[in-house]
Amino acid sequence: MYIAPVICAVLLLFAGGAAAQQGGKPIQKATITLGTATPGGGFPLYGNNFAQVMNDADPTLSIEPRNTKGSYENIPLLESGQLDLALVAGEPAYEAFKGIGRPATHLKILTAMYSSPGMFVVRADSPYRTIRDLKGQPIAFGAKGSGLPVMSRFMLDGIDLKQDEDFKSVYLDHAGDGPAMVLDGRVAALWGAGIGWPGFTTLAASPAGARFIAPGADEIARVIAKHPFLKPMTVPAGSYPNQNAPIDSIGSWSFVLTRADLADDVAYRLARTLNGSEGALCKKLGQACETTAANTLAAAPDVALIHPGAMKYFREIGVVK
């Protein structure tokens, strides 16, 4: 997908009568591009709601969501200045910050989005009940370029399974393609992550029903011992239709990242607006209730990775000293 370059970080919009006015004078309006992912997944859902809430809270902001191929495209688009902000899953962010398989990035964290406990979903009438039951079966591991297949790869490696050897791996062109493939039998299971993740919601609400498969307690311990950046997480009961019990699993935090040279005053303004909009964002999207300043400090691999402009605001409100 072609994305037009961002000509400048902050664009002054003086579109006649459409320009924001204060006391009869035009107000500087910041146009911010936000990369999400392919349609039908959790990132576009989050990104669209994030943009709407932020724009409503501050009429001098214009955050524009853009569909992309996901985390692995968003990182280079940020690095090349073609995006100002982007949603990035925990595993690609971890690899980029640590320089795993690539040079270490200089991108910064604006906010933690939400925790993403990973698990598989199968039809309710499926014979499969454990991860090892799924060996040899066609599994949809998520969209190409997204962080989901990376999380599953780390998780499976932690229990001595190889994603592309022990399973018939299927990588989707669009995240929204997965549920239909489970329902019609093209794949035995779909891998996903998060609370209220659209693919899981679709399957759980379908007439066929759904059952979730997550690592067992021993498997969780093994995964965390080998890949400590993955954390134990729980999907609360009621997160999906007909899900009557909590589900323990592992996962990571996703982030809103900024390009390295995003101005401090812009990041400060975004952090301030977001902090004041936490309640509104939570009402629009359940998993966005985790988008808080406190969670950002807790989830960041290193506080030095948080944008200095955001950190300035966090100090002002006493979240960090």
Residue ranges and their predicted role:
Residues 31-57, 61, 115-184, 279, ...:
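Bilobed "Venus flytrap"/periplasmic-binding protein-like clamshell domains
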Residues 141-155, 230-299:
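Ligand-binding clefts/hinges and TM-proximal coupling segments of bilobed small-molecule sensing domains
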Residues 48-52, 64-104, 120, 176-182, ...:
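Pocket-flanking alpha-helical
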Residues 177, 184-185, 194-212, 222-229, ...:
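An extracytoplasmic/periplasmic, membrane-proximal ligand-sensing/linker region
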Residues 102-113, 239-248:
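A structural signal for short loop-to-beta-strand junctions that line the ligand-binding cleft
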Residues 90-92, 126-127, 163-262:
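Pocket-lining segment of extracytoplasmic ligand-binding domains
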